Amino acid sequence: MNKIRKGDRVIVRTGKDKGKQGTVLAVLAEHVTVEGVNVAKKHVRPNPMLGTTGGVVDKIMPIHISNVALVDANGKPSRVGIKVEGGVKTRVLKTTGAAVGA
């Protein structure tokens, strides 16, 4: 069970975007893309076959999953634990004990 999923509200713990909060857009094997975090400028060539124009575009780049933490109701970063009740696994915040994404 993944501890961080698409749609979760996270905060960046390390790096140039430390302290920024955003929503997880995608989860890859060990990386996540977070809305508005780690934005890079990419040069795109024009493609007349597709009708796209060239130029410099902003692209959201993935960051390692260990560099983000879920945000609790108080806006503080929290680790995530797994709780099993009746054979059903649920994600639980370590700081408050509240269930995540219920």
From Swiss-Prot:
- GO cellular component terms? ribonucleoprotein complex; ribosome
Please give the InterPro entries that the UniProt record associates with this protein. KOW, Rib_uL2_dom2, Ribosomal_uL24, Ribosomal_uL24_KOW, Translation_prot_SH3-like_sf
The answer, when asked if Cell inner membrane is one of the entry's keywords, is no
Mind listing the UniProt keywords for this protein, alphabetically?
Ribonucleoprotein, Ribosomal protein, RNA-binding, rRNA-binding
Top-level taxon of the source organism: Bacteria
Q: Which Gene3D superfamilies match?
A: 2.30.30.30
Q: Which SMART domains match?
A: KOW
Q: Which GO terms describe its biological process?
A: translation
Molecular function per GO: rRNA binding; structural constituent of ribosome
Q: List the disulfide bonds.
A: none
Pfam families with a match to the protein in the record: KOW, ribosomal_L24
Q: What does this protein do?
A: One of two assembly initiator proteins, it binds directly to the 5'-end of the 23S rRNA, where it nucleates assembly of the 50S subunit. One of the proteins that surrounds the polypeptide exit tunnel on the outside of the subunit.
Tell me which NCBIfam families the record gives.
rplX_bact (TIGR01079)
Q: How does it assemble?
A: Part of the 50S ribosomal subunit.
The similarity annotation says: Belongs to the universal ribosomal protein uL24 family.
State the name under which the record lists this protein. Large ribosomal subunit protein uL24
Which organism does this sequence originate in? Ralstonia pickettii (strain 12J)
Q: Which gene encodes it?
A: rplX
